[in-house]
Amino acid sequence: MWLIYIFTLIVRKISVVIPTYNRARLLPRAIESARNAGSDLEVIVVDDCSTDETPEVCAAIDGIRYLRMQTNGGLAHARNAGVAESSCEFVAFLDDDDLRLPGSLDKQLHALTSDDRIAFCYGQALIGDARRQLPTGEIYPLRCPDGDIFWQLLEDNFIPMPSVLARKSTLVNADGFNPSLKLIEDWDMWLRLSEDHLVAAVEEPVAIHRKAVAESDQMCSNAAEICKQALRVQQMALVRPRARASESAKRRYVQKKFRDRAYEILMTEATNSIHEGKRQAAKTNILDAFRFRPFRTMASGRLFWFLSYR
């Protein structure tokens, strides 16, 4: 029995880290999808002090490693704990409301190990509906740049979190996810890794990422707060050595591209709120869009229309 157990530990190559908080109902599906995503893997569930039935749910599932945090520290803290707990060379990340597709990790492992200079591999995600995680038909991103992607990534975070498989050593050397970031901590990590490493990509769906809406109780459902936190992450990346050593015109370009993207996201949210009759939400998003791109005519026009409307 001991020989069998030791051999099992040796051949495992991938740890799938699943941070969770009060998602006992969704967690079993995430765990099952992780198990089917590849061979030679372990599943580590990091419970960020859930107050629901999460401990009992995990106790009833055989073959997983369950780690309960002493205090609720957020996603970055939980993911770092999972990485530290990992006994494998490679680490994949999966949120408790997302799903991995069968066999996806084996394909990504092949791409990741093709070059020692590669820090992580990502792929496309099918966007799932907020309630049942069923694919909506939308795929993100449409294209998956690879190689040296630092400057492309500085414009926008196009890497779906549940699609990433990384070398544990690079995550540790980067000092893990930044616990001071309550949102967009993944983009910050990918930027730090891509600054001086190559990135591999599998341009096919490898995960199902649940669409974020306010009703789904997801941290990433507030578009305005996401954009504000993302701006902070980009500003942090722009003072890192590689960005600082580049031409100022290049830095200005990626800043403009990001602000344009934030503006588009917020104006889309505002338009959706208008159609749903949520006047105050629409007004708030337009004001935030105006802050990112104050000289865009469309934002100015809608802003003043809303301010004058009774």
PLM segments and residue spans:
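Acidic helix N-cap motif at the loop->helix transition within catalytic regions
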Residues: 25-28, 52-60, 99, 103
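Short, acidic, metal-binding catalytic loop of nucleotide-sugar glycosyltransferases
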Residues: 32-41
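A conserved acidic beta->alpha catalytic loop
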Residues: 33, 47-56, 71, 95
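Glycine-rich, basic loop-to-helix element that forms the pyrophosphate-binding segment
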Residues: 69-86, 96, 107, 148
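Flexible acidic/His/Gly-enriched loops in nucleotide-sugar-dependent glycosyltransferase catalytic domains
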Residues: 77-80, 105-170, 174
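Conserved nucleotide-sugar donor-binding catalytic segment
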Residues: 84, 141-230
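Short aromatic/hydrophobic "clamp" motif used to bind/position activated sugar donors
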Residues: 91
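Catalytic core of nucleotide-sugar-dependent glycosyltransferases
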Residues: 152, 205-213, 219-246, 275, ...
